[in-house]
Amino acid sequence: MTTGQQLAAGVAALGLALPADATQKLLAYLALLDKWNRVYNLTAVRDAGRMVSHHLLDSLAAVPHFRGETVLDVGSGGGLPGIPLAIARPDLQVTLIDSVAKKTAFLLQAKAELGLANLSVVTGRVEDYRPAARFDVVTSRAFSDLREFVTLTRHLVKSGGRWLAMKGLYPHEELALLPQGVKVSADYELHVPGLEAHRHLIVLEPVE
């Protein structure tokens, strides 16, 4: 099975209706990630088939749970989940932030080559980031534990906004250590085609 066939089968299994050019852009992104990864070590996953399941489909599995108009992907690294999200949901304005300049250089190159007008890239530490407007959703795939995640980004979630944290096993201990003023509003167990590991999407909300 080619990576294109694997991606198409995975998208169908997830029940996603993607824009007409999404599959082509997702595969082009994967090729870029593979190319840059040889120099910049953006991901430990190097096999093309595993990159489809562990990166593309893992990110796409969370797509239906994003509401609102603006999203911040914290510690975006190689652009996960932000770039697949921006490709799958052109209605969203997605901002990627990472403190490592070589990673944001890759993200800017991907934005340009893929023609993602709804994508912005910021180099810097998230705790120092002061955008003109706060975000409907702040998300992360591999940034930190939940307590640190919400503490460092609380100033970036707008009133009525949410955090969406992508996790492996259900994070019982991390949830027990959440700071005051934050509540768990939902937990979605994600079933990712080709990925046998446990995946949870934890939805958190600030308590006004």
Swiss-Prot record:
| Molecular function terms, GO-annotated | rRNA (guanine-N7-)-methyltransferase activity
The record lists the catalysed reaction(s) as: guanosine(527) in 16S rRNA + S-adenosyl-L-methionine = N(7)-methylguanosine(527) in 16S rRNA + S-adenosyl-L-homocysteine
Name the EC number(s): 2.1.1.170
Query: What parts of the sequence cross the membrane?
Result: none
Annotated Gene Ontology cellular components are: cytosol
Is-annotated flag, keyword Manganese?
no
Name the major location: cytoplasm
InterPro entries of this UniProt entry? rRNA_ssu_MeTfrase_G, SAM-dependent_MTases_sf
Tell me the keywords, alphabetical order.
Answer: Cytoplasm, Methyltransferase, rRNA processing, S-adenosyl-L-methionine, Transferase
* Family matches, as CDD domains: AdoMet_MTases
Q: Any idea where this protein resides?
A: Cytoplasm
Keyword NAD applies: no
Enzyme class, top EC level, equals transferase
| Residues annotated to bind S-adenosyl-L-methionine | G75, L80, V126, E127, R141
Function per UniProt: Specifically methylates the N7 position of guanine in position 527 of 16S rRNA.
NCBIfam families tied to this protein: rsmG_gidB
Q: Which family does it belong to?
A: Belongs to the methyltransferase superfamily. RNA methyltransferase RsmG family.
The protein in question is named Ribosomal RNA small subunit methyltransferase G
Specify the species: Thiobacillus denitrificans (strain ATCC 25259 / T1)
